[in-house]
């Protein structure tokens, strides 16, 4: 089993953190800090709870003057990186909202080694206009991590993060930031812009469609942003976005020899399916082929999830497909027994469907 991210905060990691802090602040009580962190509730804490607990421990044992504490943290931060080091900006989020200048400088510093994407959001909520000016400034930074923060920190639907309801309602204030970054030389930054665009598409599909039409003829890097940023709209079969990439309503196409087995899928088992896509007027042309499963949820309702099989220009008049879906338990999806439906989609249009039952764990055992 893969190591959980929260378990990276082990004793060796925290001892190293305490030692680095002590280099900047010789009076820092390393053992007291470690005892505080590894308290009786530590094992029950999840990732972000552990992150916050570490930030609280730092605040408790560093000098109580905020600026002095930040100096020590800034000195130690370059020795730590990745998601785990986000307790540095978390310290700013919790204790620095009333000291704007010191805090914004610290967030810019810390994001170079981890990311301040969570910590910057309370500052946006507190003073949106002021923070927008800062975000626009960050978008012009020479450092790719700082430029990414301008986009990632202002995403309206950033996972695990504080929501930004004003940007959900009206994303127009952040569009100039995305415009600045739409052809950024860093893939790290471009991926953030694409994810930001995808966030916006969930509340403002027509706005993103309009932007996509404007951006699609730009540099190859920008075209990638458009494609990745429109992924939700593509899965939803949005006609305007599909057409933008050359995927039009299929004409003279048929799904043939569609087979799905088994009809009764054991708990933790898998469903397999195959079919042939045939054109009556060859070639198949520009096609995006997907399948959707209508999953049973609580109280008998269903929820659809779309999965891509292939896309591109096909010169042949027919093409065979074979795939499977596993119902092995995963943390991001909970399964319920009952009648499911698997549908073949071509360019967003439903072409054929089959039903199958997912058996309960009890029925599967019997």
Feature locations, PLM:
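Beta-strand-rich binding/interaction modules
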Residues: 270-278, 282-298
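Short beta-strand and strand-turn-strand segments in soluble, beta-rich domains
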Residues: 253-256, 297-311
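A beta-strand/beta-hairpin structural motif
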Residues: 273, 304-330, 358
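Short glycine/proline/serine/threonine-rich loop/turn segments at secondary-structure transition edges
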Residues: 329-339
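Surface-facing alpha-helical segments and adjacent helix-coil boundary elements at the starts of domains
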Residues: 1-241, 253, 266-269, 274
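Short acidic/polar inter-strand loop motif in beta-rich domains
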Residues: 329-331, 345-354
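Short beta-strand segments of immunoglobulin-like
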Residues: 259-266
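Short beta-strand elements
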Residues: 311, 349-366
């Amino acid at each position: 089993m893969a190591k959980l991210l929260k378990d990276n905060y082990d004793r060796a990691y925290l001892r190293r953190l305490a030692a680095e802090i002590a280099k900047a602040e010789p009076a820092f009580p390393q053992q007291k800090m470690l005892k505080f962190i590894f308290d009786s509730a530590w094992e029950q804490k999840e990732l972000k709870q552990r992150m916050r607990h570490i930030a609280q421990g730092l605040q408790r044992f560093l000098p109580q003057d905020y600026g002095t504490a930040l100096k020590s943290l800034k000195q130690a931060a370059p020795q730590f990186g990745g998601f785990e080091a986000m307790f540095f900006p978390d310290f700013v989020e919790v204790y620095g909202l009333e000291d704007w200048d010191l805090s914004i400088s610290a967030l810019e510093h810390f994001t170079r080694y981890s990311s301040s994407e969570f910590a910057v959001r309370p500052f946006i909520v507190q003073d949106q206009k002021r923070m927008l000016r800062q975000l626009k400034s960050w978008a012009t930074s020479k450092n790719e991590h700082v430029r990414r923060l301008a986009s990632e920190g202002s995403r309206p639907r950033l996972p695990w993060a504080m929501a930004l309801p004003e940007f959900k309602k009206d994303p127009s204030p952040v569009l100039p930031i995305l415009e600045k970054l739409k052809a950024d030389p860093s893939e790290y930054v471009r991926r953030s812009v694409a994810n930001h665009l995808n966030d916006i598409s969930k509340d403002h599909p027509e706005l993103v469609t309009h932007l996509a039409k404007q951006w699609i003829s730009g540099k190859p890097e920008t075209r990638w942003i458009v494609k990745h940023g429109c992924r939700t709209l593509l899965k939803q079969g949005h006609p305007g976005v599909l057409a933008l990439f050359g995927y039009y309503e299929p004409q003279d196409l048929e799904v043939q020899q569609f087979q799905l087995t088994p009809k009764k899928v054991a708990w933790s088992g898998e469903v397999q399916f195959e079919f042939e896509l045939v054109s009556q007027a060859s070639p198949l042309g520009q096609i995006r082929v997907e399948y959707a499963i209508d999953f049973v949820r609580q109280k008998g309702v269903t929820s659809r999830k779309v999965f891509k099989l292939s896309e591109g220009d096909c010169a042949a008049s027919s093409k065979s497909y074979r795939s499977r879906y596993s119902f092995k338990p995963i943390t991001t999806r909970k399964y319920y027994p009952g009648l499911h439906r698997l549908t073949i989609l071509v360019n967003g249009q439903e072409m054929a469907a089959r039903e199958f039952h997912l058996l309960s764990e009890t029925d599967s055992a019997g």
